[in-house]
Amino acid sequence: MAVSHRLGHVALRVQDMERAKCFYLDLGLRLTWEADDWCYVQWPTGEGIALLSPDHKAAGPHFAFHVQNRAEVDQVREQLLAKGHSCGPVHDHRDGTASFYMQDPEGNWLEMLYEPAGGLPSNIGAEPIPLTYS
């Protein structure tokens, strides 16, 4: 099953959001999205890390392969199902992204994700959100 994709992001559960955020910003990543229970830091080349607070419920720790278009999300899912893998349903999100989650044979969660060009700040390398350090 050859699919054009790239490793786009990794999502990590963190206990101290501010401490984790400062660590990754000090490494040179930029803050491109921030919400109450998660944030997204990104290299200028587009790869990023989603930092998830203990209260974040939408998704847990995982890594994501970014595919080239919306049709590939369905194509990859169908190919995986045909090979006997279990996959969650495809979700079309209000921001134009589409994805599904699954586990590899070792139980690691992964996401197959399409992000349209010009979408959320997490996928366009937007300017960082100003932070106040204490």
Where does each model-flagged region fall?
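N-terminal beta-strand motif that seeds the catalytic metal site of vicinal oxygen chelate
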Residues: 1-18, 63, 118-134
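Vicinal oxygen chelate
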Residues: 7-14, 55-79, 83-134
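Residue-level structural signal for beta-strand termini and adjacent loop
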Residues: 37, 54, 113-115
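Solvent-exposed strand-loop boundary residues in beta-sheet-rich modules
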Residues: 45, 55, 116-118
